[in-house]
């Protein structure tokens, strides 16, 4: 798996975060939450690709993706990822 795949996932995450910011400014809060989740998911999948050198799993579970990518997270962050996963 090339670094380009990881970079593509991360570029998508950045674009989705921009969309989320625009939705927030427009007061489309539920749509904003969805794109925040999507941005986090893509960023975590970029990490998974970089660390495992394989395609990321077909999953929207942010904590699972963080675990697979070896992301160190305390309990508060894990709870945040669990909550954010409900916005998908």
Can you name each region flagged by the protein language model?
Residues 1-88:
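Terminal alpha-helical segments
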């Amino acid at each position: 798996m090339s670094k380009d795949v990881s970079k593509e996932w991360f570029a998508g995450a950045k674009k989705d975060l921009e969309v989320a910011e625009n939705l927030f400014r427009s007061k489309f809060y539920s749509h904003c939450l969805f794109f925040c989740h999507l941005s986090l998911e893509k960023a975590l999948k970029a990490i998974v690709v970089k660390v495992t050198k394989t395609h990321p799993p077909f999953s929207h579970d942010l904590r699972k993706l963080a675990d697979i990518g070896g992301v160190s997270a305390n309990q508060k962050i894990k709870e945040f990822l669990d909550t954010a996963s409900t916005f998908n």
